[in-house]
UniProtKB/Swiss-Prot annotation:
Protein's name according to its UniProt entry: G-box-binding factor 4
Stretches for region Leucine-zipper: 215-229
Species of the source: Arabidopsis thaliana (Mouse-ear cress)
Entry keywords, A to Z: DNA-binding, Nucleus, Phosphoprotein, Transcription, Transcription regulation
Residues bearing the modification Phosphoserine: 27
GO BP terms: positive regulation of DNA-templated transcription
Region ranges (Disordered): 1-46, 250-270
Positions of the bZIP domain: 187-250
Subunit structure: DNA-binding heterodimer with GBF2 and GBF3; non DNA-binding homodimer.
Record Pfam families: bZIP_1 (PF00170)
């Protein structure tokens, strides 16, 4: 049985309620002031639950009124659990439960990797793909007194790291593979274009050299033909002169008479 009682009260009731001691029931006695004005009247709600009484105070007008509300409520399991336990016991159980949860969190293995850790590690691996991690091997003392060195594993390439991390990040692995394939295709196309340019340049050089050799050969041939023609012309001229000398009749040339001297045929004297 839970009962609610609303009645007007003064500040003296509040002081008397605060000075009273807590009962042995598991219910908690508390007071709450909604308006701390000392001149205003206050109303009080008494809440009876499980054998205890809880009082709540709030501000109201000066008209006194009383209101009782009786509510029947089943409290079987709750009373059976809370019976025999005080507030300190409940608080100790809460604190011990929090400590247990903290200890359970601390006992979790540290090798668990979250998604943020994996993405950060993958970005670091991609940024340092071209760098070689050179570290001094650490010394370790064995039980027999001898020393051994632990050599760290080297990262070979970012592509291997991306392929090895497919289990934790499938999207990043696919993206890295697509980027590597695009880079490989671009490099292959660039290499093919370079090879084609070199082959075309070599073919043009060969054509130029062949044309130059052909021109030189033609010039030499023309020079030889010119010399041969000049020789033939000279020989033909000599043969013709020889034939003319054989065919012509020899003629004796008579000497010409001397020319008459000029004289004056008429002369006049003045």
């Amino acid at each position: 049985m839970a009962s609610f009682k609303l009645m007007s009260s003064s500040n003296s009731d509040l002081s008397r309620r605060n000075s009273s001691s807590a009962s042995s029931s598991p219910s908690i006695r508390s007071s709450h002031h909604l308006r701390p004005n000392p001149h205003a009247d206050h109303s009080r709600i008494s809440f009876a639950y499980g054998g205890g009484v809880n009082d709540y105070t709030f501000a109201s007008d000066s008209k006194p009124f009383e209101m009782a509300i009786d509510v029947d409520r089943s409290i079987g399991d709750r009373n059976s659990v809370n019976n025999g336990k005080s507030v300190d016991d409940v608080w100790k159980e809460i604190v011990s439960g929090e400590q247990k949860t903290i200890m359970m969190k601390e006992e979790e293995p540290e090798d668990i990797m979250t998604l943020e850790d994996f993405l950060a590690k993958a970005e670091m691996d991609e940024g340092a793909s071209d760098e070689i991690d050179v570290k001094i091997p650490t010394e370790r003392l064995n039980n027999d007194g001898s020393y051994t060195f632990d050599f760290p594993m080297q990262r070979h390439s970012s592509f291997q790291m991306v392929e090895g991390s497919m289990g934790g990040g499938v999207t990043r692995g696919k993206r890295g593979r697509v980027m590597m394939e695009a880079m490989d295709k671009a490099a292959a196309q660039r290499q093919k274009r370079m090879i084609k340019n070199r082959e075309s340049a070599a073919r043009s050089r060969e054509r130029k050299q062949a044309y130059q050799v052909e021109l030189e050969t033609l010039a030499a041939k023309l020079e030889e033909e010119n010399e041969q023609l000049l020789k033939e012309i000279e020989e033909s001229t000599k043969e013709r002169y020889k034939k003319l000398m054989e065919v012509l009749i020899p003629v004796d040339e008579k000497p010409r008479p001397p020319s008459r001297p000029l004289s004056r045929s008429h002369s006049l004297e003045w």
